[in-house]
Amino acid sequence: MKTKNYLSEAQNFLKRNTQVKSFDIVMHDCNGVGRGKIIRRNELLNLYKSGRQFPLSLLGMDITGEDTPETGLILEQGDGDIKAWPIPSSLKLLHNSKPPRGELFMNMYDIDGKKLLTDPRNVLENKIQDFKKKGINFYAAFELEFFLVSNELDEYGKLKPAKSILGKRASIKKTDVYSVDHLHGMLPLIDDIYEATKLAKIDAETIISEYAPGQYELTLKHQKSLLKAADDILRLKRIIRAQARKHGVTACFMAKPMENISGSGMHFHISLYDQKEKNIFAERNNEKINKNLNYALGGLSLIHI
């Protein structure tokens, strides 16, 4: 893998952002956890020229960051090296970071330059190519639910919803679903999230106060690039975490961080279209049921048999 063609991307970024002194270089494992390093400004161009080596076991860690011996990547293979390369167009300026910093995402390859199939982004890219060979394209979007929790635990040592930033109004036992007033209490944080997504060229749209206390949902605009949609949702989680820390609260994306109240999910909306921009599941010529839809339903049914 060579990214010399994209070297100008890094050069132009450095020229435009002379105040940036360091960069987060981030890869995502199979659990969606961002792993990587912080590099200094003087290392960026060489990263684009030569890549950066990482241990192979990085791809086999569990959600807590522990090695998983069952993968066979540790003792059996001696935890060899892989090489990470910058993903084109992923170099972004981080909002509200002091001193100013940048961030870029990385893709993983073996030492010979072949894409690693254990990199989840490479897996997705291969599947997209399979669909393209069949003349199928996508529209996709995510809706992300999350909690904003206090940095302090309750009297029982458990998580509790964060108080509003403005006014410090507590919402520990009160559900404020669709409450605009509740959102107003978090406006400084919400505004920073929107500013950060704008810098990252992520089309963030509606935010609501969700059903559980301290729970929110932020939607992203649908787009044709399924790969960018996946990159955007991973970056959005990093943005929300970072901006929450700036405002003295913690963002939590766990499915069920607090018992006895609703948990969080992540809705993924996807539509499949042919080369003429027509939905492949739509009925045509007065047919009773579209054959593609019939096959899709059959495939989903087989999963549960």
PLM segments and residue spans:
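Residues that form or immediately flank small-molecule/cofactor binding pockets and catalytic motifs
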Residues: N151, S209, K256
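Positively charged, low-complexity, intrinsically disordered RNA-binding extensions
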Residues: S225
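ATP/Mg2+-dependent ligation/transfer catalytic cores
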Residues: M1-T206, K228-D232, V249
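Short, conserved phosphate-binding/catalytic loop or strand-edge motifs used
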Residues: L144, E210-L218
